[in-house]
């Protein structure tokens, strides 16, 4: 019997293949963990609407640590069990900096994804082309993000998709004075949450809800925005396609996301064998 009661799994670059699909073998391995009484939870920067298609394929994954830790959501009860917002006072400044670099701002609430209508067709320019079909289908599209920003007293998460990693670095320099949590993701994305919010803080909220300890959790991820979660869990696994510094901090390294790395890690955990 595994000593771990919860496995937190990143999505993009980890649970999902490069084409954003689920490997049937991964589905079977996650289902086997569930049959053995282990919760497998999403740990993702995505919003709840962006998870629904995967939840239909993996109904055994009841919980999500979503919005990079700002939201913990229960898909069985269809409600949030934890949410931490960033102040609306910072949203307009984020949008201003995004406009300065001709970047794409993205507001994420508990139940909505909001973007500027004319930028969705240009997502490849922001290194986000793989997500364009999802954004076309699931986002609420507005004409003016500055006007939209004024509607919010608080919001769980704001992303900015830059045209280059160089622009992202400059945008971060302009924004880092704000009391927020920052994470780099994808090719040139900057993710922002309230100060102290990380995938680790969201996972702690979930473990509290479930009545288990962080030492009884495992985590699987590939990128900088998984770092805090991987450092906090009892057993950490990096994907074979992950960043080298992420591999260096983890307890083990599995296969890449196109070769069922998550499933291999889960099987290792269930059988208590090393990867």
Annotate each predicted stretch with a short phrase.
Residues 37-41, 61-62, 156-157, 215-216, ...:
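Short active-site oxyanion
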Residues 21-128:
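Active-site phosphate-binding/coordination module
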Residues 51-55, 171, 246, 262:
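Hydrophobic packing residues within well-ordered alpha-helices of enzyme cores
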Residues 58-60, 67-68, 76, 176-178, ...:
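Short, structured coil segments at secondary-structure junctions
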Residues 1-11, 28:
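Non-catalytic pre-domain segments flanking phosphatase-related domains
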Residues 89, 97, 101-104, 108-220, ...:
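Conserved acidic, metal-coordinating active-site core of Asp-based
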Residues 2-6, 17, 23, 190-275:
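Mg2+-dependent phosphoryl-transfer enzymes with acidic/Ser/Thr/Gly-rich catalytic loops
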Residues 31-35, 99, 176, 231, ...:
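Anion (oxyanion) recognition and catalysis
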